[in-house]
């Protein structure tokens, strides 16, 4: 993390693999929770932003590029969406997108760090919107890995893994045993969606995580899009299904309704995102 004071604000930077990514603005608050360092930063370009352990997580004016794209391929592909699980997602953005679906009856949001939720509600309320007041949302401040391990078989129609980078409290979300438990608790006609890092800035992590999911699920495919505040701007999400590749084929009536509420996601965008796999990444996934 590097800050250079000047009259127009400070540069707040994330360092990854000898590359620096930064935004100019001012720090609002920074604290150490029981799990990680949490920073709220008001950027000149993208509004208020959240950082965990010095890594950009989300920002007000570009968060839809992430949250729409981790949620809708899964919820538009699953046969039913009565019961949905989100692991992580303490900023509320993924929950907000899930709760757009009237068919959804129960949304379990499992966040390990209550301060992420509290600070997001206080400073980033535009991201979560009204999700925190929705009676369908069940917020549990506990360990998501243990929650999945203890859940009953075939418990959920959709599982969204909206964790941070594979370090600190989120490290266990990039583990094969964790994905095996997700497979066990996912209904046969359901869909799993997970953030799987950047194929450019974190190629090894991306390759290893996608391969891991492919080893556990019969059908799994990475989808690629852009998130400006993330290293390199290129990001990925991987979607997986059990009986058939439901994540590749959105239910049209559901997708047409939801896409009208979105700034980025649409069935057409989704097709392009799955097709956008870089040739070198595709070859490495086949090795």
Curated annotation (Swiss-Prot):
List the protein's name: Polyamine aminopropyltransferase
InterPro entries listed in its UniProt record: PABS, PABS_CS, SAM-dependent_MTases_sf, Spermi_synthase, Spermidine_synt_N, Spermidine_synt_N_sf
List residues binding spermidine: 67, 91
Summarizing the function annotation, the protein's role is: Catalyzes the irreversible transfer of a propylamine group from the amino donor S-adenosylmethioninamine (decarboxy-AdoMet) to putrescine (1,4-diaminobutane) to yield spermidine.
- Provenance organism: Prochlorococcus marinus (strain SARG / CCMP1375 / SS120)
Any GO BP: spermidine biosynthetic process
Q: How does it assemble?
A: Homodimer or homotetramer.
Main localization category: cytoplasm
Subcellular localization = Cytoplasm
The signal sequence is: none
User: Which taxonomic lineage does the organism of this UniProt entry have?
Assistant: Bacteria, Bacillati, Cyanobacteriota, Cyanophyceae, Synechococcales
Q: Identify one Pfam family in the record.
A: Spermine_synt_N
């Amino acid at each position: 993390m590097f800050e250079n004071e000047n009259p127009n604000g400070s540069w707040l930077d994330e360092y990854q693999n000898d590359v620096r990514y930064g935004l100019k603005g001012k720090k609002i608050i920074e604290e150490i929770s029981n799990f990680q360092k949490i920073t709220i930063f008001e950027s000149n370009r993208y509004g208020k932003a959240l950082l965990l352990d010095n890594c950009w997580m989300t920002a007000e004016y570009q968060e839809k590029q992430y949250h729409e794209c981790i949620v809708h391929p899964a919820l538009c592909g699953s046969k039913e969406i009565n019961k949905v699980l989100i692991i992580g997602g303490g900023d509320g953005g993924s929950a907000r997108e899930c709760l757009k679906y009237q068919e959804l009856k129960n949304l379990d949001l499992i966040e390990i760090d209550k301060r992420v939720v509290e600070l997001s509600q206080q400073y980033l309320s535009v991201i979560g919107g009204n999700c925190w007041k929705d009676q369908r949302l069940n917020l549990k401040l506990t360990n998501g890995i243990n929650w999945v391990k203890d859940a009953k078989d075939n418990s959920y129609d959709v599982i969204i893994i909206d964790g941070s980078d594979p370090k600190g409290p989120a490290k266990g979300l990039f583990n094969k045993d964790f994905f095996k438990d997700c497979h066990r608790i996912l209904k046969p006609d359901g869909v799993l969606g997970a953030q799987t890092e950047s194929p450019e800035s974190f190629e090894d992590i991306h390759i290893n995580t996608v391969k891991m999911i492919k080893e556990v699920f019969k059908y799994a495919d990475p989808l690629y899009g852009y998130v400006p505040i993330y290293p390199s701007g290129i990001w990925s999400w991987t979607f997986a299904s059990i009986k058939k590749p439901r994540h590749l084929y959105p239910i049209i009536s559901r997708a047409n309704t939801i896409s009208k509420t979105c700034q980025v996601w649409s069935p057409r965008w989704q097709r392009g995102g799955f097709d956008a796999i870089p040739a070198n990444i595709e070859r490495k996934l086949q090795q």
